[in-house]
């Protein structure tokens, strides 16, 4: 199993862990070994708002069910949920960033120029100076052509929480 996902499990909030544990426990009630069977796993994940395809589910199961027992314990389940959340957020954030770029790109030419950046930043109601706007433009405009293209925008937004 990937250490990166095990590390990500440690980043889950108590609330998230409790939510996952409650869903997991519903399906473990009759099990003596404290594990859920792989066929029940899909139901649990759908209950938690995840919607893996049968292929994705089988792939996840194969990765975490190291002993081939056909069951998944809670720790393995948490790792799988972190993977699903990560995959989910990747798709959404890309889509959200694309929408955000289009909002900034007022004339729809595929670039954000200084005026468009200024209009959007001032519309937020935050106090922002001309110098701040120019500094942001410089940070975002990696190839120094005086405007920010979509790839530059994505790169710039990676550093923004």
Curated annotation (Swiss-Prot):
InterPro entries: CALM/Myosin/TropC-like, EF-hand-dom_pair, EF_Hand_1_Ca_BS, EF_hand_dom. Belongs to the troponin C family. SMART domains: EFh. Keywords: Acetylation, Calcium, Cardiomyopathy, Disease variant, Metal-binding, Muscle protein, Phosphoprotein, Repeat. This is Troponin C, slow skeletal and cardiac muscles. Ca(2+) 1 binds at residues 65, 67, 69, 71, 76. One of its GO terms (molecular function) is actin filament binding. The keyword Ion transport does not apply. Troponin is the central regulatory protein of striated muscle contraction. Tn consists of three components: Tn-I which is the inhibitor of actomyosin ATPase, Tn-T which contains the binding site for tropomyosin and Tn-C. The binding of calcium to Tn-C abolishes the inhibitory action of Tn on actin filaments. Cardiac muscle Tn-C can bind 3 calcium ions per molecule. Domain I does not bind calcium. Ca(2+) 3 binds at residues 141, 143, 145, 147, 152. Residues 16-51, 52-87, 92-127, 128-161 form the EF-hand domain. GO terms for biological process: cardiac muscle contraction; diaphragm contraction; muscle filament sliding; regulation of ATP-dependent activity; regulation of muscle contraction; regulation of muscle filament sliding speed; response to metal ion; skeletal muscle contraction. GO terms for cellular component: cardiac Troponin complex; cytosol; sarcomere; troponin complex. It is linked to Cardiomyopathy, dilated, 1Z: A disorder characterized by ventricular dilation and impaired systolic function, resulting in congestive heart failure and arrhythmia. Patients are at risk of premature death. Cardiomyopathy, familial hypertrophic, 13: A hereditary heart disorder characterized by ventricular hypertrophy, which is usually asymmetric and often involves the interventricular septum. The symptoms include dyspnea, syncope, collapse, palpitations, and chest pain. They can be readily provoked by exercise. The disorder has inter- and intrafamilial variability ranging from benign to malignant forms with high risk of cardiac failure and sudden cardiac death. The modification N-acetylmethionine is found at residue 1. Ca(2+) 2 binds at residues 105, 107, 109, 111, 116. The modification Phosphoserine is found at residue 98. Pfam families: EF-hand_7 (PF13499), EF-hand_8 (PF13833).
């Amino acid at each position: 199993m990937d250490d990166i996902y095990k590390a990500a499990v440690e980043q889950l909030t108590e609330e998230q862990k409790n939510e996952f544990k409650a869903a997991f426990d519903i399906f473990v009630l009759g099990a003596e070994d404290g594990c859920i069977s792989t066929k029940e796993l899909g139901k649990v994940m759908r209950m938690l708002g995840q919607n893996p395809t049968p292929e994705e589910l089988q792939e996840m199961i194969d990765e975490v069910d190291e002993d081939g027992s056909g069951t998944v314990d809670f720790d393995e389940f948490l790792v799988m949920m972190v993977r699903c959340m990560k995959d989910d957020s990747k798709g959404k954030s890309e889509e959200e960033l694309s929408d955000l770029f289009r909002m900034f790109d007022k004339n729809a030419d595929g670039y954000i120029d200084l005026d468009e950046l200024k209009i959007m930043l001032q519309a937020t109601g935050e106090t922002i100076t001309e110098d701040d706007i120019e500094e942001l433009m410089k940070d975002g405009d990696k190839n120094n052509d005086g405007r920010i293209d979509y790839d530059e925008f994505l790169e710039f937004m990676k550093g923004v929480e």
